[in-house]
Amino acid sequence: VFQFLGRIIHHVGNFVHGFSHVF
């Protein structure tokens, strides 16, 4: 379960990081 949540947090973190570079 924690690995699943970790993967989601990791993907969300990458998405936010990439999204912040757009602007």
UniProtKB/Swiss-Prot annotation:
Tagged with keyword Signal: no
Entry superkingdom: Eukaryota
Keywords from the named record: Amidation, Antibiotic, Antimicrobial, Secreted
Subcellular localization: Secreted
Single Gene Ontology BP annotation: defense response to bacterium
GO cellular component: extracellular region
Protein name: Clavanin-B
InterPro entries listed in its UniProt record: Clavanin
Principal subcellular localization: secreted
Modified residues (Phenylalanine amide): F23
Coiled-coil regions, chain positions: none
Alphabetized Pfam families for the sequence: Clavanin
Function: Has antimicrobial activity.
